[in-house]
Structures are given as C-alpha cells and as structure tokens.
C-alpha cells in the first residue's frame, strides 16, 4: 500500500473513526493514589501492521499521562480526530472510541488490537518510556557507551532506543530520557512495528 493510501486510511478502515472530529471523554477514572508521582509525555507515533493479510499503517500524535500505575493514552490522527482513548489502572482497563460504548477488560492490548488492528504495549510502556525494563519480567538488554539502554527484548517485544534527549530538572543537572523509541513485535502472521518520537520535556 502506498503512502498516500495509508494516509487516506488513517482510521484503519473502521467507519466510526471516519466521522467528524468528536472529542472522546474517558469513561474510566484513575484509581485513587494521592501520593503517586504524575508525569506526562506528548509526541508522535506511527504503526505498521498486517490485518486480514494486508499491510496497513497509521500515524498521528499521542498524549501519555501517568499517575503511579494509572495510565491514560490518547491517540489522535493528523487531522485532529480522536482515534482512541485508553485508560489502564490496577483495577482494569477501558478503551473508548468515538460514538461507541466503552470496552472493558483486565488488560487493554487485546481490546486495541480487535478494535483498531494494532495495539500499543501499554503495560510495557509504563517502564520503557522511562528507559528501563519492566521489573519482574525476563528481559535481555544491551547498553550504549554511555550506559543507556540501546536494545531491550521483553514480553514478546524488541525495543530500540534510537535517540535520547536532555530533560531539565529545576535546581539539578539535566537527565537523559528517550527521544525516539522503535518497538517491534514478531507475532507470526501478524507482525507489528511502532515508532514513538517524544517531545522535549519542560521543567
């Protein structure tokens, strides 16, 4: 499929995603954790995958908000349409789509794949966005000359840290955080690759 057609099919062939730019309010609230630290990331994503035996692709922007083990992920097309809102908490996960009832499950990855044709590894991204492996799960990692993660194989995914960036910290030296992350899942007949480019952080 050529690039222009991929852009025309940004909404993955799901008719509900081709409707007008409607905002999607999350139907699941964060579990209460008043002492948990909060962090937000914004950036761009692109995904290439196989659906019904055909190569497909989607791209857009994302907003990631986390508070402790609570996560909200918004996916938005280049035209400003909300593709999906994912909310994952210790008590469960919800996928909200435009003009559709909420979909609930213990984990959101399967819901995303069924509805959108691809799934971002939300559980792993809680740690991978911070440049670290998920604790309690087997992993193989390599590091660059500066001691930063270069590659990580964990939970069926290969994670490549392509670029890093400084993030300012008031009253302290800047720390290095990922700038670009490439993820690949080899699932036999349903491979999936995802590229994340993370916006610079502000103090």
UniProtKB/Swiss-Prot annotation:
InterPro entries: LolA/LolB/LppX, OM_lipoprot_LolB
Claim: Lipoprotein is one of the keywords in the record: yes
Chain residues carrying a lipid of type S-diacylglycerol cysteine: 21
Signal peptide start-end: 1-20
PROSITE patterns: PROKAR_LIPOPROTEIN
Main localisation: membrane
Keywords, sorted A to Z: Cell outer membrane, Chaperone, Lipoprotein, Membrane, Palmitate, Protein transport, Signal, Transport
Location in the cell: Cell outer membrane
N-palmitoyl cysteine-type lipidated residues: 21
Membrane topology: Lipid-anchor
Any single Gene Ontology cellular-component annotation: cell outer membrane
Pfam family for this entry, one: LolB
GO BP field: lipoprotein localization to outer membrane; protein transport
Function according to Swiss-Prot or TrEMBL: Plays a critical role in the incorporation of lipoproteins in the outer membrane after they are released by the LolA protein.
Protein family according to the UniProt entry: Belongs to the LolB family.
Assembly behavior: Monomer.
Protein name (Swiss-Prot/TrEMBL): Outer-membrane lipoprotein LolB
Organism expressing this protein natively: Cupriavidus taiwanensis (strain DSM 17343 / BCRC 17206 / CCUG 44338 / CIP 107171 / LMG 19424 / R1)
Gene: lolB
């Amino acid at each position: 499929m050529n690039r222009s057609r991929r852009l025309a099919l940004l909404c993955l062939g799901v008719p509900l995603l081709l409707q007008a730019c409607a905002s999607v309010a999350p139907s699941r609230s964060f579990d209460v954790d008043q002492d948990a630290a909060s962090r937000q990331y914004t950036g761009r994503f692109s995904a290439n995958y196989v659906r019904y035996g055909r190569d497909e692709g989607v791209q857009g922007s994302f907003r990631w908000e986390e508070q402790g083990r609570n996560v909200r992920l918004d996916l938005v097309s280049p035209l400003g349409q909300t593709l999906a809102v994912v909310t994952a908490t210790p008590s469960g996960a919800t996928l909200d789509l435009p003009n559709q009832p909420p979909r609930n499950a213990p984990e959101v990855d399967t819901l995303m794949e069924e509805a959108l044709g691809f799934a971002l590894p939300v559980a792993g991204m809680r740690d991978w966005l911070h440049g670290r492996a998920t604790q309690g799960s087997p992993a193989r990692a390599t590091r660059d000359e500066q001691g930063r993660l270069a590659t990580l194989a964990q939970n069926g995914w290969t994670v490549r840290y392509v670029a890093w960036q400084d993030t300012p910290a008031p009253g302290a030296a800047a720390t290095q955080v990922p700038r670009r992350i490439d993820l690949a899942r080899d699932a036999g007949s349903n491979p999936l690759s995802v590229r994340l480019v993370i916006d610079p952080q502000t103090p």
